[in-house]
């Protein structure tokens, strides 16, 4: 795959989340969106990284203490290297692994009004996968079918723990290129 340009620390929410959540609270926000990075909490298949899980526990707890409802994104373009090694979302096996991940975080963070976004901007996710060389443009239909199936799996899994939760996806509107 093509080398990805590192973003480095960006806004450094990771180390400044208490300050950032305090700022959000001071603006009167009642919802705060966060992605739970699968690659951080399950860096090896079936092995949970408890240090990272406790980090997310504290972020969610801090968010709720400040009066905000979490809106959790399960995939914001990043997944573990071992998932990439098996073909990413082009491989149906990934759907089972994704279900395992979603089950873990839905059980842990669901309820109390938690909202869920399964995939951040699926079409942009597809474009990103093409750009870095993980898949080809001609893979669009099978890739999107698998992402759609993964969304359904996540929806059912999250609803198992909280039937009243809001579960969806978000969309980015992009120009469509007809020469795939």
Language model segments and positions:
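Surface-exposed cleft-lining segments at the edges of enzyme active sites
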Residues: 5-8, 45, 140
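Charged helix-capping and loop-helix junction motifs
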Residues: 49-55
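Active-site mouth loops of central-metabolism enzymes
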Residues: 2-15, 92
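Glycine- and acidic
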Residues: 3, 41-42, 137
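Catalytic domains of carbohydrate-active enzymes, especially glycoside hydrolases
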Residues: 15-37
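N-terminal small/glycine-rich loop or linker at the start of catalytic domains
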Residues: 1-7, 37, 75-85
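Active-site region of glycoside hydrolase catalytic domains
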Residues: 57-180
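Glycine-rich, proline-tolerant flexible connector loops at the mouths of alpha/beta enzymes
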Residues: 36-48
């Amino acid at each position: 795959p093509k080398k990805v340009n590192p973003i480095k620390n960006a806004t450094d929410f990771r180390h400044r989340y208490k300050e950032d959540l305090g700022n959000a609270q001071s603006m009167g926000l009642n919802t705060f969106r966060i992605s739970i990075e699968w690659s951080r909490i399950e860096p090896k298949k079936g092995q949970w990284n408890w240090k990272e899980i406790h980090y997310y526990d504290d972020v969610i707890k801090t968010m709720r203490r400040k009066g905000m409802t979490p809106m959790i994104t399960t995939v914001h373009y990043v997944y573990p290297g071992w998932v990439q090694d098996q073909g990413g979302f082009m491989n149906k096996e990934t759907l089972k692994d994704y279900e395992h991940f979603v089950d873990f975080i839905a059980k842990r963070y669901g309820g109390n009004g938690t909202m869920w976004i399964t995939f951040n901007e699926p079409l942009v996710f597809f474009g990103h996968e093409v750009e870095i060389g993980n898949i080809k443009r001609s893979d669009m239909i099978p890739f999107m079918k698998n992402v759609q199936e993964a969304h359904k799996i996540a929806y059912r899994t999250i609803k198992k723990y909280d039937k009243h939760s809001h579960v969806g996806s978000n969309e980015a509107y992009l120009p469509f290129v007809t020469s795939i």
